[in-house]
Amino acid sequence: MSAPFQLTSSDPSVIDPVGLAADTHEWIEAVVPGGVHETLIAAGIIAHPYVKDHEENCRWVEDRAWWYRGTVPIPVGDDPLVLTLTGVDTVADIWVNGHHVGHHASQYRPFQVTLPPIDANKAKVLIRFAPPLDGLAEPPATRAMVNAVSDFLNAAAPQNLDAEPGSGILTLDLAATRRRKGMFSWGWDFAPRIPSIGLTGPVELTRRSPIEVSHHVDTMAIGDGDSADVNVMVSTVHHDGPAPCTVDVTLTSPDGDRVSGHAQFKHGSATVDLQLDNPQLWWTHDLGKPSLYQVDIKICDKDANTIATDSGMAGIRTIEVDCSPDTDDPETDGPARHFTFILNGVPVFARGANLVPQSMLPGSVTPQQDHDLVRACRDANMTMVRVWGGGVYASDAFMTACDEYGILVWYDFMFACIDYPGDDEEFMSEVRTEADYQTRRLANHPSLALWAGGN
């Protein structure tokens, strides 16, 4: 369940509720999903930073600490309570009923924590967002790299033109490389400096399910178009302890044809092997129809009682990248290599565009806007888009639209064209957690064609 929130700000030196209570603050209604800028615009405190020189006039926003407060109803039940911040941008500390329950420092994954029992029917949630770069120092190795690039460019351009503000790595605040947040936030060649901050998604308080279920659908082989071998891998987490159980999986085609399978769990996982006759394959829109199957999963105990379910959509397709030598290449120092996407055994003419964030304020982008953007890509006859690594991961709505419209996605991990502090273990731990979350989130989208290391 979610609830309305209010917003106020403080000096960054105020770091806990005691310090906040000692100051005088005016609270305003918060725009959630959205962020601090959206809230201040709605309240008439700042003008939209896109207009005139208001980008400069609202620069103070990134130097303040921002606080959200709200009262969230507690759902009925006896299972443990789980607090989820579905969109966190970026550095946050969270209190529930006066108790600190967690710290978060990434724009690229949600915050979730299991709460201790609460003897009340509501939970008072307080969230402090620190200035995004507060307390961070620029990595020395990154500074050395940028200086070397700058020296090279200055030598190549005798007129010694100054780099434009927001022109990429030469004007970037290099401390930003230590923070898992879209690098475009601090200015790029297409973007002003407007680092977003705040709650970009709802705050939810739910009861944890005794059994958590996840699945992944993998097309193993397609036989001359008249059959397909599909593996459905199902994983469970039993919070009340392990118990013997089985899984039933059903795939339903767009025409309503069903194929089912059954398997026994072992160590929390099971794989159901299915063979589909005359499968309706997923294609890019220029090669065919992007057909999607309904996936229904049922977990049963030893007495055949249903104890958990899961569902989703899947596309039956194989995809690979042909990197074989190009024997027709005339280069004298050896042949070049192909880089061709092969979908269901057919080469794809990849044509499209790079996707940068639709807004400097990602929390204000709606699912409908994502859907309309993908439809426009299809109408422009694109077959592939690349999610650029200096921005943010694409939303579920965007990826679902790519599945439906038959658009492949080349996906960068969120790293821009700059060195990152790979020797910082705290940073690397955050990156590993992020990568695990994002790859699992996107794994079942048939539109996902490739993961790339970054920009």
Residue ranges of each PLM-predicted region?
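A cross-domain feature marking catalytic cores of carbohydrate-active enzymes
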Residues: 129, 352, 389, 411-413, ...
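Secreted/periplasmic carbohydrate-active enzymes, especially glycoside hydrolases
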Residues: 1-385, 393, 404
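Generic structural signal for well-ordered alpha-helices
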Residues: 374, 399, 435-439
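Aromatic/hydrophobic pocket-lining residues that form the small-molecule binding cavity
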Residues: 370, 395, 431, 435
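Active-site groove signature of glycoside hydrolases
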Residues: 437-455
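Ligand-binding grooves and catalytic loops that recognize ribose/phosphate and carbohydrate rings
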Residues: 423-442
